Amino acid sequence: MATYAIGDIQGCYDSLQRLLERCAFDPASDRLWLVGDLVNRGPKSLATLRLIKSLGPAALTVLGNHDLYLLMVAEGGAKFRGKDDTLQEILDAPDCAELLDWLRHQPICHTEGEYCLVHAGLLPQWTASRARELAREVEITLQGPDFREFILNLWGSEPAGWSDNLSGWARLRVIVNAMTRMRFCTLDGVMEFKVKGKLSNAPAGHIPWFDLPDRKSAKSVLVTGHWSALGLKVTPNLLALDSGCLWGGHLTAVRLEDRQVFQVDCSPTEALPLKR
């Protein structure tokens, strides 16, 4: 049995199919770990969502910011932001309700052995096990009767830092933003959300979350996506797998058992023009 961790798909269904062939993925014996952002901007978000759902226990995904955005739009908590959004086909699908119910029952953080699977990253105050506890707070709300109220209160970037004293929607918003949106932080873990580019674009006083000194999750292996400008980054304690398929780059998988990397080029019909 092999476990393949795969970067952000974002509706690039054709590239995903070619990557699974490249890996010789067998759903009867292998597993997929998906870093989230299954949908949006690529041309086949509906097909992607249906495929991952159909794999059952052979596929484990955490939620990314685009997945949560889909849930927000469906509940009226957000409006489409631009012409690059490709979620309408999901909302119009006959199985939309079933797909969205499945999506909101996925975790936002998964820990297993030395690994921690999360879309964006973890704040420096959190061990992987603590992050899993905090993620569960979000998941209970996301899957429970307060789901719609939660979605309507999720949007926003404040508070930008963690405190154990946080409560209510503010507490859940910080957890979600760290795990699904974070890239750069100050040394004390205050998040910055405006800059999305390369490491050289770091705002003054900010560094990548994974370079924060004394980060409590440093002994775990973090498996992440979200940061296409960072590209594939493989270190002993970090597998950053968003290699920019949507932007004409690659879709990447790493086999966890031996760290072998598998990649396919983005299908020409799926790539968006790079934003400079």
UniProtKB/Swiss-Prot annotation:
This is Bis(5'-nucleosyl)-tetraphosphatase, symmetrical. The lineage of its organism: Bacteria, Pseudomonadati, Pseudomonadota, Betaproteobacteria, Rhodocyclales. Belongs to the Ap4A hydrolase family. The keyword Hydrolase applies. The keyword Protein biosynthesis does not apply. Hydrolyzes diadenosine 5',5'''-P1,P4-tetraphosphate to yield ADP. Its EC number is 3.6.1.41. It comes from Dechloromonas aromatica (strain RCB). Keywords: Hydrolase. It catalyses: P(1),P(4)-bis(5'-adenosyl) tetraphosphate + H2O = 2 ADP + 2 H(+). GO terms for molecular function: bis(5'-nucleosyl)-tetraphosphatase (symmetrical) activity. The gene is apaH. NCBIfam families: apaH (TIGR00668), PRK00166.1 (NF001204). It holds the Pfam family Metallophos.
